[in-house]
């Protein structure tokens, strides 16, 4: 398994990044982190 962290200013931008990432990799799970200034997603993929 591989892991990646995606970071964006808004949840909408993060979702777009994740959709693009998902087209390239077989994503097994995602954990979202939402902070006042930015959002992040920890992605595990094969």
Range-by-range predicted roles:
Residues 9-33:
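A short, charged, amphipathic alpha-helix used as a generic interaction element across diverse proteins
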Residues 4, 14-20, 43-45:
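Intrinsic disorder/low-complexity segments enriched in polar/small residues
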Residues 35-46:
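C-terminal edge-of-domain segments
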Residues 1-9:
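Short amphipathic
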